[in-house]
Regions:
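Exposed, flexible binding/inhibitory loops of compact, secreted disulfide-stabilized domains
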Residues: 5-163
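Juxtamembrane low-complexity tails/linkers enriched in Ser/Thr-Pro and polybasic
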Residues: 1-3
């Protein structure tokens, strides 16, 4: 009888530890980071896109290419990924970085940090020209569109490569 009780206590203890571990993982989970990279003819920074029509205006203004690559969804088009349904749930933060044929560039979004009310998003990104290739001529902007929470009203961009 006593061994049955001790077995039950061990099982209850193991289940409790598993439940606590799951709760801690959920509490400490960071929001999913999704961003898009595309080429453009012109640059702009710090813009918060809140609707499909605003995105369409930006595409016309700076010439963002229709084909995009996301860090989660491989290849798509702007209109497929960022439709009216998307803007019901999220907003887009925009950062554009200048590139040319003279260097090999590294660019990525590292993390998005929100304040407690989720109205301010700090976007840590990496951008640096890495290896000098010795050519110059073709220039463009690489536009990174970062998906942020719909409550965001203020953006801060921090280049991790300059820290």
């Amino acid at each position: 009888m006593e061994t049955d009780n001790s077995k039950k206590m061990i099982i209850i203890g193991v289940v409790a530890i598993i439940i606590i571990a799951i709760i801690l993982v959920i509490i400490n989970r960071k929001p999913e980071l999704v961003y898009t990279i595309s080429k453009a003819n012109d640059g702009t920074d710090g813009i918060l896109i809140t609707s499909k029509s605003e995105l369409d205006d930006l595409v016309k203004k700076i010439g963002i290419g229709e084909n995009i690559e996301t860090n989660k969804y491989k290849k798509a088009t702007l209109s497929e990924r960022y439709n009216d349904e998307f803007f019901n749930e999220k907003k887009l933060a925009v950062i554009a970085v200048y590139e040319d044929d003279s260097k090999e560039y590294i660019h990525s979004i590292d993390e998005v940090i929100y304040d407690s009310s989720k109205t301010t998003a700090t976007i840590n990104y990496t951008y640096k020209g890495d290896i000098y290739l010795g050519t110059l001529g073709n220039t463009w902007y690489t536009v990174m569109l970062v998906e942020v929470e719909p409550t965001v009203t203020t953006l801060n961009f921090v280049n991790s490569a300059q820290k």
